[in-house]
Structure formats: C-alpha cells, structure tokens
Amino acid sequence: DEAHEGTTTALGDDVIKNLVKEGNGYDTKFLALSGTPFNILKEFDDNIYTWDYVMEQQRKAQWDELHFGDSNPYDELPELKIYTYDLGKILTDKSYVELEDKAFNFREFFRVWTGDIKHDHKAMPATAQVGDFVHESDVWSFLNLITKDDPDSHYPYANEEYRNLFRHALWMVPGVKEAKALSKLMKKHPVFGCGAFDIVNVAGDGDEEERSEDALQKVRQAINGAGNDGYTITLSCGKLTTGVTVPEWTAVFMLAGSFSTSAANYLQTIFRVQSPCNKDGKIKRCCYVFDFAPDRTLKMVAESAALS
C-alpha cells in the first residue's frame, strides 16, 4: 500500500526482493496499491488497474438501476466539489504573484516578520512583533472577505447556511510560523474569534500557550467539544494530510503551495475531506475544496485525469 512511497526507497526494494520469489515452483504475484501513483506509473507498461473517484461516484449513481433492492455500498461516499477564487485579482499587490508561473504566491502573502532586515527586505515597524504578518492588513481583509455577511456573496463563511456546511474544516498554510500568526489573528477576528470557532493549530508544535500533544487527538477533542453548534478550523502545513481520517471534516482550504505543487500531494490533501461520515444519523453527502489559485487547480485536475 502507498506504493508511490514504499516502492521507491532502498528499504522498499529490499522488502520486495525478499518477498517476491520466482522459479522452483514459485510465482509470487506483486500488487502495488496507490491512490496517487504519478511517480511510479512509468514502471508499469501494462497490468495497470484504475479505480478512481469519478468511477466510484458513477457506480454510486447507477447502483439502484443496476442492483435494485440491494444496499448501495457507495452510498456514504460524499461527492467532492471544488470551488476556486482568484485572490490575485482581489489583492492587487504584485508581490503576491510568482513571476515564473503567474500563480498566487501564498508564501509571500502569509510572510511573517523575522526581525532580520536582510530577510524582511525592510525595517520592521515599531508596532509589529517578530512572528506577525508582514501583510497583516491584507490577511485581515481576506478574513473579512470570506466572512462578510452578504446574501449575494458566495464566499465560504458569508452566511450561516454556508458555515453549517463547513462546520469542521482543514486550512492548509505555507508553514509553521505562518500557521501560528494566522491562529493569533483569527482569534482576534469578530467572526472567527467570537467564541463559536475553535482554531486548532497542529502545524509544528502548535501555539506556544498550548501543550504539544498528538495532532489528531487535538482535532478530535476540539470537534467533540464543539457539539452541534460550534465550529472548528484546523491549521496545518502538512500534518494530518496522509494516512489519517477525520470523518467530520467537510472542507479543505488550499492556502499553500504553488503552480508547481505535485499532484500527488495535492490529491492526498483534498481527499482527506472525502472520507465517509455518518454521525448522529446525519450522513455527509458533499465535501468541498476551496482553492484560491485557479490555475493551480486546473493543473491538478488535468494531471489526475491522466490516470484514468
């Protein structure tokens, strides 16, 4: 399993050599399983079997027609919906655009002060502290934008209906320092800091005032504590994006990466939210991806389609 990682290492080679036996009556069958096999496809000229998300959803939709009366084993697998917003058009600072590929530069947008003028490219304002956002006013505007109470707005937290759809969400950010700064800012925000939202920072060791503990345990405790009326937002720069299931997550916000982000990492992350969830009699029917770099989204979808 996870063959795109396990079969590409020296340890993986040694394990395979010890297990696969040929001759003297032996004919070991080798099955490499992977949900994101982009880097190992070239090793297989044939005998490639694909079962992807689209096929799964087609089988789910056709089940009653083809197997009337039988329970649908795909019924609880949510439909994945991807929405894109172009932050590059909303935030016009040219430093947010990567020159090489014209994609939105999340690392610059969420850059924090280090106190080192060589790294910061300018003197840190007297009102700022090391670890604060360099572009704090723009990050604040972004938080306002996605929470603005407007009946015509289609941003994720613009009204109570949307907020209930994304009651438990995963936000991917560029790094540990950026996650800490965002957690601090969100707790001051009139919507995210109103007490209804529990901001769970699992990047690195989390926030200084919180004990370092198992990231998954922190998230599950927050979700359980939220009950039926509360919300959670998990901030991560990589944790909980592979080999982990948080069934209650219904949305992932892609606020990190670039146009050159690998399709394998991207898909591993977004499909965290597609895990089934049947809780208190409620089935998760849909899950959502919000990507704020549309060109990157199209590239990822195209690369994933190449597998089919």
Walk through the language-model features, giving the residues of each.
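Conserved RecA-like P-loop NTPase helicase motor core
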Residues: 4, 199-307
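Interdomain helical connector at the RecA1-RecA2 junction of SF1/SF2 helicase-like NTPases
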Residues: 25, 29, 41-169
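SF2 helicase catalytic motif II
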Residues: 1-31, 36
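Conserved catalytic network of the ASCE P-loop NTPase/AAA+ motor domain
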Residues: 19-27, 74-75, 162-164, 224-229, ...
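Conserved helicase motor "Helicase C" RecA-like lobe of SF1/SF2 P-loop NTPases
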Residues: 175-203
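Conserved H-loop
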Residues: 35, 174, 238
